[in-house]
């Protein structure tokens, strides 16, 4: 490192993306600092992935042990199940503390300098850190922006963080309302509906688009609606906006038809979770000091090497990863982007393969996917001149699923008819989040279903649902 610089790399934001980048940078021999103004670990560790999975694990056990029909099929009888909200909430909070501590310690152990305060770009290769007691200026050969995202709250919604709240508050599980409305049917809304119904709450789900779960493959969404929504007596509204939400007791929700814009109903519920997506936290980053502007939604434009783009060209020595780029708002995607950015900083040209990054909803049963949906693949096929085919298998034909008495589910693979290249995989079923990685690796390696059909899977395992899907594709 030149004496003109304090660090080879300064990272703004110690979420999963920044943390992953910092660890890889140190392994590559870069003197690295990471700046964080709030909680180490960012959204994932403190208000997202980690606490929500703890809640899902606990509530999932309650659901499983409360399902007398399922238990009797296995020859098990339990005389009632009890739980305490406070203990489940404490489990989530304790896990957050542990992961946050582990993350911080890993940075210290590898000699990454952790600097507390608000970090912002103050010029080319320069970062200003505004702390409680001092302001520092750091010179860095490379700067990486990892500011993350925050929940999006549409206009007309009054948030009081008690009766009307976002996922930031929901993960604390401070109350179990008798009746809760959830605005949005994406993975956040789905996961919290899973938690709340398992713990005895009545749920109403409101979706602005015509169909529930619009981000999932339609066949998967149809099964999910049957298994995760209808079987749990969740009331649903589709094609409807929650145009006004007034916090209080009760919470008042005005519903408006998305097409006609007419008010169609008013709900009075005990609480409301607003799960309408997330927006980038890109304000006050000092981007203007290097002539960079965010797009109209606030995202930082980057290329697949994670270089910040201005007027179609990379900005020297400036990188961005994670939710703030708008590419794929997932913690593991951010971590992968961070590693790719560091590789490029070190002169090893690398690009992010977004098609091979999997995603999952940790409902009961789980949903996972990687690559293209059937519709997306067909659209690509029309452009590039190839035909798309699909193959499906059902968990009800899988020996391990039958042994578990967990037979709701399907695995669907999407592939090119000419070359057999796997383009996408979509699963709903027990342990779907674990099963999808096999397909993700196959997509990353551009494998053909004709090759995959000859791979031997252990028997009896759930992984055979993909094995059977590959074989049906040949």
Swiss-Prot record:
Catalytic reactions of this protein: N(6)-[(R)-dihydrolipoyl]-L-lysyl-[protein] + NAD(+) = N(6)-[(R)-lipoyl]-L-lysyl-[protein] + NADH + H(+)
Chief location of this protein within or outside the cell: membrane
Intrachain disulfide bonds: 44-49
Cofactor binding, note field: Binds 1 FAD per subunit.
Gene3D superfamilies referenced in this protein's UniProt entry, alphabetically: 3.30.390.30, FAD/NAD(P)-binding domain
UniProt-annotated location(s): Cell inner membrane
Residues engaged in binding NAD(+): 184-188, 207, 275-278
Keywords (A to Z) from UniProt: Cell inner membrane, Cell membrane, Disulfide bond, FAD, Flavoprotein, Membrane, NAD, Oxidoreductase, Redox-active center
Positions bound to FAD: 36-44, 53, 119, 323, 331
Function per UniProt: Lipoamide dehydrogenase is a component of the alpha-ketoacid dehydrogenase complexes.
Family: Belongs to the class-I pyridine nucleotide-disulfide oxidoreductase family.
Entry protein name: Dihydrolipoyl dehydrogenase
The species this protein was found in: Synechocystis sp. (strain ATCC 27184 / PCC 6803 / Kazusa)
Lineage, opening ranks: Bacteria, Bacillati, Cyanobacteriota, Cyanophyceae, Synechococcales
Gene symbol of the encoding locus: lpdA
């Amino acid at each position: 490192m030149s004496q003109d610089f304090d660090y080879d790399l300064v990272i703004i934001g110690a979420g999963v993306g920044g943390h992953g980048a910092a660890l890889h940078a140190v392994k590559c021999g870069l003197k690295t600092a990471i700046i964080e103004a709030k909680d180490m670990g960012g959204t994932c560790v403190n208000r997202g992935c980690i606490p929500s999975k703890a809640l899902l694990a606990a509530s999932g056990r309650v659901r499983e042990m409360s399902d007398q029909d399922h238990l009797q099929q296995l020859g098990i009888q339990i005389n009632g199940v009890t739980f305490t909200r406070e203990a489940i909430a404490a489990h989530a909070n304790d896990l957050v503390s542990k992961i946050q501590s582990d993350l911080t310690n890993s940075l210290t152990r590898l000699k990454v300098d952790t600097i507390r305060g608000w970090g912002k770009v103050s010029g080319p290769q320069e970062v200003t850190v505004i702390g409680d007691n001092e302001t520092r200026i750091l010179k860095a050969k490379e700067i990486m922006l990892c500011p993350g995202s925050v929940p999006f709250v549409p206009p007309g919604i009054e948030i009081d963080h008690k009766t009307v709240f976002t996922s930031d508050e929901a993960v604390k599980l401070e109350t179990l309302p008798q009746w809760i409305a959830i605005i949005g049917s994406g993975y956040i809304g789905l996961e919290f509906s899973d938690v709340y119904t398992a713990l005895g709450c009545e749920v109403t789900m409101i979706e602005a688009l015509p169909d529930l779960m619009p981000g999932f493959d339609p066949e998967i969404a149809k099964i999910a609606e049957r298994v995760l929504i209808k079987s749990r007596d969740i009331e649903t509204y589709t094609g409807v906006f929650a145009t006004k939400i007034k916090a209080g007791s009760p919470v008042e929700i005005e519903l408006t038809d998305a097409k006609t814009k007419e008010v169609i109903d008013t709900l009075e519920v005990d609480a409301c979770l607003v799960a309408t997506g997330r927006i980038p936290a890109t304000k006050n980053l000092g981007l203007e000091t290097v002539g960079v502007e965010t797009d109209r939604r606030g995202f930082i434009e980057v290329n697949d090497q994670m270089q910040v783009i201005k007027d179609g060209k990379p900005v020297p020595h400036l990188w961005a990863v994670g939710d703030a780029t708008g590419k794929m708002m997932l913690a593991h995607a951010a971590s992968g982007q961070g590693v790719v950015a560091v590789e490029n900083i070190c002169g090893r040209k690398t690009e992010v393969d977004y098609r091979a990054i999997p995603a999952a909803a940790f409902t009961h049963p789980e949903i996972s996917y990687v690559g293209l949906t059937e519709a997306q693949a067909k659209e690509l096929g029309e452009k590039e001149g190839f035909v798309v085919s699909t193959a499906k298998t059902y968990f009800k034909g899988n020996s391990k699923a039958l042994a578990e008495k967990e037979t709701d589910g399907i695995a669907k693979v999407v592939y090119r008819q000419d070359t057999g290249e796997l383009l996408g995989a979509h699963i709903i079923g027990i342990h779907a989040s674990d099963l999808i990685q096999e397909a993700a690796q196959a997509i990353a390696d551009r494998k053909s279903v004709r090759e995959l059909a000859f791979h031997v899977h252990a028997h009896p395992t759930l992984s055979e649902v993909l094995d059977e899907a590959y074989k049906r594709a040949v």
